[in-house]
Amino acid sequence: DIVTRMFVEAPFAGHESESFSMPVRNVVPKPLQKPHPPLWVACSRRDTIHLAATKGIGALSFSFVEPDEARMWVQDYYDTIASVACVPGGFAVNANLAVVLPMMCHRDEQTAIDRGIDGAHFFGYSLAHYYAFGSHRPGRTDIWAEFQQNRESFGFARPIAAQTGQVLGAQLFQQGIGALRGAIGTPDQVRELLRMYAEVGVDQVIFVSQCGNNRHEDICESLELFAREVMPEFHDGEEAREKAKLERLAPAIEAALARREPPREAPETVLTPVLGT
């Protein structure tokens, strides 16, 4: 609330609380986007996605969610956006739910796996190291070495994730044990995975390729192939889909913004005290 008021109030009308105090000041520069850039929150749990919806904020999931599970998250997110529980944290509603997936695209599936799976697993392991189980000594802990030693114990078994000829998912499974895979495969495999996320209503998929020991040249080749052979299907009609979405959500967004306290006017009598002598 404080930050977004600094974005839109001219001057910022000040704030006083136990944790933060600031007098009336003209905070510049103001954002180029009006009223301010879209607000997002990174989410690892469904509860945080629900919280994002109550604040009218975009939800960016780092939990490598499967399409079927994402369907439930999407339903709850947009139901909440359309409910009286949504009181925007900013002065615009950013109704979007995005998921993060590792990606490496190549016409040969095994090549895509060899180029991308270890980096993808290191990305997932390093997130868990910092947010879940890691014991870190700054400047001394070698996360890559620990990853190589412990990866299978934490759900990053290479043999399971490296299966070929499978329908892609956030994870692949073998005898009930899962391992992170994501969008690592051929253009056809990646396209089919993205279709599944699109069908359940996920707005955006954010790819992670630049992780671990992944080579720059391989990443560039993967992105170029994706742009040529996969992206056009999802880019076509994007403008019309976004327009229809905004029209569908317009009444809910208008109602939500009406529940948000508007920008304040600072008293014209406020004077900044002279600090020098």
How does the language model describe each region?
Residues 48-49, 68-69, 106-108, 212-217:
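Flexible loop/turn segments at secondary-structure boundaries
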Residues 39-42, 57-62, 95-102, 205-207:
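Hydrophobic faces of well-ordered beta-strands that scaffold small-molecule active sites
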Residues 44-45, 49-74, 78:
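A conserved active-site cap/scaffold subdomain adjacent to cofactor or substrate pockets
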Residues 64-67, 135, 207-223:
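Glycine-rich, proline-tolerant flexible connector loops at the mouths of alpha/beta enzymes
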Residues 44-46, 64-65, 102-104, 210-212:
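Active-site beta-loop-alpha junctions enriched in small/polar residues
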Residues 1-30, 68-202, 231, 235-277:
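An alpha-helical appendage that flanks or caps ligand/catalytic pockets
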Residues 194, 221, 225-226:
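Amphipathic alpha-helical/coiled-coil segments positioned at domain termini
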